[in-house]
A protein has these predicted regions:
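Extended, highly charged
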Residues: 1-284, 288-299
Length: 299
């Protein structure tokens, strides 16, 4: 049976010596520095940070997740010793056939362990790291999925875009021009309407893999992620926007991007080791709901 969520996968990593647990690292550059060093080692397990100063024990950060073939194999419920060539063949077959499984709407899930609205929203309670010395802030969404709905067709799209924490109830969203998220947001704003958006952090790694693929406009990524793991993704609808999010995710928040509402964003050091540019102004998300599991894991 495939892993149901991120925690199942983390358990598999631990069983297969693919996980290192680090206690006491500070979110101010220490976590980022450890991850940078770890990525350059010959053996580089995923790293789970706990006991982060200033935050409750159990509020964790997971990094270096998909930088090895064995961990990708485990995420896909494949034998851990499948070779790189076999993994490439697996992906080629998947992309050629693109099997799908419809998502399964459920009434609840562990994501609803803690739900906050209005003045109770505070995404800064999550120990979001400053990954690099010259970063412009704390980026809660680097390995995340951003969910939107086309206002004309009703198509649900999700993609991997950059999200920066801008305070307790505000985030910013950076989408490159021409990406599906950018197209959808512009459709709302051309009508003079706010764009609803949901951000999910800490989900099954297969969902993140699909978020980074170049799917055709109109293709439902939830269907594709279900096809990748062999069963439908369990989803719940966010209370304000109605956007679907994985019921077993660690963290999610929703809100609206209003026309001409922008905020300073970035920069963020990229995984390649460079900064792509300086700070820019990007669309602001004004949050209306924030939820997370007990003892959440930031991915």
């Amino acid at each position: 049976m495939p892993n149901k969520d991120l925690r199942d996968w983390v358990t598999d990593l631990k069983k297969n010596n693919q996980l290192q647990i680090v206690s006491g690292a500070d979110r101010e550059e220490e976590i980022g520095a450890i991850v940078d060093i770890q990525m350059r080692q010959m053996t580089n397990p995923a790293v789970l940070f706990d006991d982060i100063p200033g935050y409750p024990k159990g509020y964790r950060v997971l990094a270096n997740i998909l930088t090895s073939v064995p961990r990708i194999n485990l995420a896909l419920d494949e034998p851990i010793d499948k070779s790189e060539v076999e993994l490439v063949d697996y992906w080629r077959t998947y992309m050629k056939n693109q099997p799908t499984h419809d998502p399964i709407e459920v009434n609840g899930g562990p994501l609803l362990d803690n739900v906050y609205e209005g003045k109770d929203i505070d995404i800064t309670k999550i120990p979001t790291p400053r990954w690099h010395e010259h970063d412009g802030g704390y980026f809660i969404g680097t390995a995340c999925m951003v969910v939107m709905k086309d206002p004309d067709s009703g198509w649900i799209n999700y993609g991997a875009y950059r999200v920066q924490s801008q305070g307790p109830s505000t985030a910013s969203l950076m989408t490159s021009k021409g990406k599906h998220g950018d197209i959808i947001r512009n459709k709302y704003h051309e009508k003079g309407e706010p764009c609803p958006v949901a951000v999910v952090v800490g989900m099954h790694p297969a969902l993140f893999m699909v978020a980074g693929l170049e799917m055709p406009y109109g293709k439902n990524e939830y269907d594709c992620a279900g096809g990748l793991i062999g069963e439908g993704i369990e989803i719940i609808n966010m209370p304000k926007t109605g956007l679907p999010v994985p019921a077993n995710a660690e963290i999610a928040f929703e809100g609206f991007i209003h026309p001409d509402d922008r905020i300073d964003e970035g920069p963020l050091g990229e995984w390649t080791g460079y900064y792509a540019g300086g700070a820019t102004t990007q669309p602001a998300i004004r949050l209306e709901t924030f939820m997370h599991r007990d003892n959440p894991i930031l991915l």
